[in-house]
Amino acid sequence: MTRSLRKGPFVASHLAKKVDAAVASNSNNIIKTWSRSSTILPTMVGLTIAVYNGKQHVPVYVSDQMVGHKLGEFSPTRTFRSHVKSDKKARR
Protein backbone atom coordinates (compact mmCIF):
# COMPACT_ATOMS: atom_id res chain seq x y z
CA MET A 1 0.00 0.00 0.00
CA THR A 2 1.47 3.33 -1.00
CA ARG A 3 1.58 6.47 1.07
CA SER A 4 -1.26 8.96 0.71
CA LEU A 5 -0.54 11.84 -1.67
CA ARG A 6 -2.15 14.17 0.85
CA LYS A 7 0.60 13.39 3.37
CA GLY A 8 3.57 13.65 1.01
CA PRO A 9 6.88 11.78 1.26
CA PHE A 10 8.47 11.13 4.65
CA VAL A 11 11.83 12.75 5.34
CA ALA A 12 13.23 13.00 8.87
CA SER A 13 13.38 16.65 9.94
CA HIS A 14 17.02 16.50 11.05
CA LEU A 15 18.02 14.99 7.70
CA ALA A 16 16.06 17.62 5.76
CA LYS A 17 17.89 20.38 7.65
CA LYS A 18 21.29 18.83 6.85
CA VAL A 19 20.38 18.41 3.17
CA ASP A 20 19.15 22.01 2.89
CA ALA A 21 22.35 23.28 4.52
CA ALA A 22 24.52 21.18 2.18
CA VAL A 23 22.65 22.40 -0.90
CA ALA A 24 22.79 26.04 0.25
CA SER A 25 26.54 25.93 0.95
CA ASN A 26 27.20 23.80 -2.17
CA SER A 27 29.39 21.43 -0.13
CA ASN A 28 29.98 17.80 -0.95
CA ASN A 29 30.64 16.56 2.58
CA ILE A 30 29.18 13.20 3.54
CA ILE A 31 25.94 13.49 5.53
CA LYS A 32 25.57 10.81 8.23
CA THR A 33 22.08 9.56 9.03
CA TRP A 34 20.34 6.76 10.86
CA SER A 35 17.03 7.44 9.11
CA ARG A 36 16.68 4.51 6.70
CA SER A 37 12.98 5.18 6.21
CA SER A 38 13.43 8.64 4.71
CA THR A 39 12.41 9.07 1.08
CA ILE A 40 14.96 10.38 -1.42
CA LEU A 41 13.87 13.76 -2.78
CA PRO A 42 15.07 15.57 -5.92
CA THR A 43 16.97 18.06 -3.72
CA MET A 44 19.23 15.21 -2.52
CA VAL A 45 20.52 14.35 -6.01
CA GLY A 46 24.29 14.71 -6.19
CA LEU A 47 24.86 14.39 -2.43
CA THR A 48 26.57 11.52 -0.64
CA ILE A 49 24.59 10.28 2.35
CA ALA A 50 26.06 7.72 4.76
CA VAL A 51 23.18 5.44 5.82
CA TYR A 52 23.55 3.31 8.96
CA ASN A 53 23.01 -0.42 8.41
CA GLY A 54 23.22 -1.52 12.05
CA LYS A 55 27.00 -1.84 12.08
CA GLN A 56 28.50 0.98 10.03
CA HIS A 57 27.55 3.92 7.83
CA VAL A 58 27.41 2.92 4.15
CA PRO A 59 28.04 5.86 1.79
CA VAL A 60 25.32 6.21 -0.85
CA TYR A 61 25.76 8.61 -3.77
CA VAL A 62 22.27 9.79 -4.72
CA SER A 63 21.50 9.78 -8.45
CA ASP A 64 18.33 10.86 -10.22
CA GLN A 65 17.10 7.26 -10.68
CA MET A 66 16.92 6.88 -6.86
CA VAL A 67 14.31 9.63 -6.36
CA GLY A 68 11.21 8.22 -4.67
CA HIS A 69 12.99 5.25 -3.09
CA LYS A 70 13.94 4.92 0.57
CA LEU A 71 17.51 5.42 1.81
CA GLY A 72 17.52 2.00 3.49
CA GLU A 73 17.11 0.24 0.14
CA PHE A 74 20.69 1.12 -0.77
CA SER A 75 22.29 0.07 2.52
CA PRO A 76 21.94 -3.71 2.99
CA THR A 77 21.71 -4.91 6.59
CA ARG A 78 22.47 -8.58 6.04
CA THR A 79 25.63 -10.05 4.56
CA PHE A 80 25.32 -13.24 2.55
CA ARG A 81 27.71 -15.96 3.68
CA SER A 82 28.02 -18.40 0.80
CA HIS A 83 26.90 -21.96 1.35
CA VAL A 84 29.73 -24.12 2.55
CA LYS A 85 31.00 -26.99 0.48
CA SER A 86 29.40 -30.28 1.56
CA ASP A 87 32.60 -31.72 2.92
CA LYS A 88 32.80 -33.82 6.07
CA LYS A 89 36.01 -32.08 7.12
CA ALA A 90 34.33 -28.68 6.94
CA ARG A 91 31.62 -29.77 9.40
CA ARG A 92 34.10 -30.71 12.14
UniProtKB/Swiss-Prot annotation:
Per the record, the similarity remark reads: Belongs to the universal ribosomal protein uS19 family.
Taxonomic lineage of this organism? Eukaryota, Cryptophyceae, Pyrenomonadales, Pyrenomonadaceae, Rhodomonas
Is Chloroplast given among the entry's keywords? yes
**InterPro entries, from UniProt?**
Ribosomal_uS19 (IPR002222), Ribosomal_uS19_bac-type (IPR005732), Ribosomal_uS19_CS (IPR020934), Ribosomal_uS19_SF (IPR023575)
Task: Specify the species.
Answer: Rhodomonas salina
Question: What protein does this entry describe?
Answer: Small ribosomal subunit protein uS19c
In Pfam terms, one family for this protein is: Ribosomal_S19
| Single GO cellular component term | chloroplast
Could you tell me which PANTHER family the record lists for this protein?
RIBOSOMAL PROTEIN S19P FAMILY MEMBER, SMALL RIBOSOMAL SUBUNIT PROTEIN US19M
Residues spanning the membrane: none
Localization terms from the record: Plastid, Chloroplast
Q: What is the purpose of this protein?
A: Protein S19 forms a complex with S13 that binds strongly to the 16S ribosomal RNA.
An individual GO BP term: translation
Q: What keywords are annotated for this sequence in UniProt?
A: Chloroplast, Plastid, Ribonucleoprotein, Ribosomal protein, RNA-binding, rRNA-binding
User: What PROSITE patterns does the record point to?
Assistant: RIBOSOMAL_S19
